[in-house]
UniProtKB/Swiss-Prot annotation:
Segments crossing the lipid bilayer: none
Keyword hit for Membrane: no
Residues carrying Phosphoserine: 4, 36, 50, 103, 125, 139
Keywords, ordered alphabetically: Acetylation, Heme, Iron, Metal-binding, Oxygen transport, Phosphoprotein, Transport
Family: Belongs to the globin family.
PROSITE patterns: GLOBIN
Binding site for O2: 59
Protein's name in the database: Hemoglobin subunit alpha
Length: 142
């Protein structure tokens, strides 16, 4: 999915407003994913998946950091996320559908925390961006 200039601007503006809350929102989105899609828990058998656990918070920060990197390199996602793509494809072997689940939960989390900025245009741009990130992360599965 190709991101237009308007999409890129919407993503950068929205992510800029998230600022220091990115890790917190990443953890909240993970918790939502685990609650809404329980099969995703199978990838984290060694984690304490309870609300507010330090392990979920730390992984939420990793998700946020990866997305922050993706936003910073929005014109070159494949190179920016190459190492992460390798990790998920060859070592972790995460089912690609789980990226869609997490993307949905990220959208819900952002909409809850920033309803005034979460316009239909921003929603569509973020959805396209998360889809593009998911596509890159699953590109090496073939």
């Amino acid at each position: 999915m190709v991101l237009s200039s308007a999409d890129k601007n919407n993503v950068k503006a929205c992510w800029g407003k998230i600022g220091s809350h990115a890790g917190e929102y990443g953890a909240e989105a993970l918790e939502r994913t685990f609650c809404s899609f329980p099969t995703t828990k199978t990838y984290f058998p060694h984690f304490d998946l309870s609300h507010g656990s330090a392990q979920v918070q730390a992984h939420g920060q990793k998700v946020a950091d990866a997305l922050t990197k993706a936003v910073a390199h929005i014109n070159d996602l494949p190179n920016a996320l190459s190492d992460l793509s390798d990790l998920h494809a060859y070592k972790l072997r995460v089912d690609p559908v789980n990226f869609k689940f997490l993307s949905h939960c990220l959208l819900v989390t952002l909409a809850c925390h920033h309803p005034e900025e979460f316009t239909p245009a921003v929603h569509a741009s973020l959805d396209k961006f998360f889809s593009a990130v998911s596509t890159v992360l699953t590109s090496k599965y073939r």
